UniProtKB/Swiss-Prot annotation:
Protein name: Potassium/proton antiporter CemA
Chemical reaction(s) catalysed: K(+)(in) + H(+)(out) = K(+)(out) + H(+)(in)
Task of the protein: Contributes to K(+)/H(+) antiport activity by supporting proton efflux to control proton extrusion and homeostasis in chloroplasts in a light-dependent manner to modulate photosynthesis. Prevents excessive induction of non-photochemical quenching (NPQ) under continuous-light conditions. Indirectly promotes efficient inorganic carbon uptake into chloroplasts.
GO CC annotations, alphabetized: chloroplast inner membrane
Main location: plastid
Pfam families to which the protein is assigned, alphabetical: CemA
Organism: Atropa belladonna
UniProt record similarity statement: Belongs to the CemA family.
Transmembrane segments: 7-27, 107-127, 189-209
A single BP term in Gene Ontology: potassium ion transport
Keywords: Antiport, Chloroplast, Hydrogen ion transport, Ion transport, Membrane, Plastid, Plastid inner membrane, Potassium, Potassium transport, Transmembrane, Transmembrane helix, Transport
InterPro entries: CemA
Amino acid sequence: MAKKKAFTPLFYLASIVFLPWWISFSVNKCLESWVTNWWNTGQSEIFLNNIQEKSLLEKFIELEELLLLDEMIKEYSETHLEEFGIGIHKETIQLIKIQNENRIHTILHFSTNIICFIILSGYSILGNEKLVILNSWAQEFLYNLSDTVKAFSILLLTDLCIGFHSPHGWELMIGSIYKDFGFVHNDQIISGLVSTFPVILDTIFKYWIFRYLNRLSPSLVVIYHSMND
């Protein structure tokens, strides 16, 4: 019985690691056909924001220039001019299809992530007792570590998250989240988040050291500052 009770939190921990991927994959597959059918049959217009309009216009201009250059190399005749118009028409339709698929991708991924968040939130609430056990194990493990190891771990974690080289990692992570939710890549928003989020984390961390860690283990704070200097 004791082994079973000890194994249950470990199984719950493993499920927390692998369940999000499985839920995301399953929900995505279930919604894919429905979202595609709804968008293709229920939407009479294509909705584009300024960034998408600019991107589509740039692609169209680039395509037109390439086709025009190709026709300039050939002899000018009515047949070639007709073929040029047909080529522009076909490629324009192809660009619209690609844009339509991108919109379906955006709706699908956003809906999938919202549903996954709701399911995982409910799963966490139902497994609150197991989370308490895992938390007690983690606290016991950290308590048994020496102050030097704790200080080194804190220093390593802070350097990775809010160090001078961390903006590159934040840029990749935020860009990945943007892509996962199906949002259009926006350099201005990503740059703004990269420049502000680590600063906020750094402020919170310093406040945590001042209010909590300094009271809990003054020797750990001394070692941390010595290693940091």
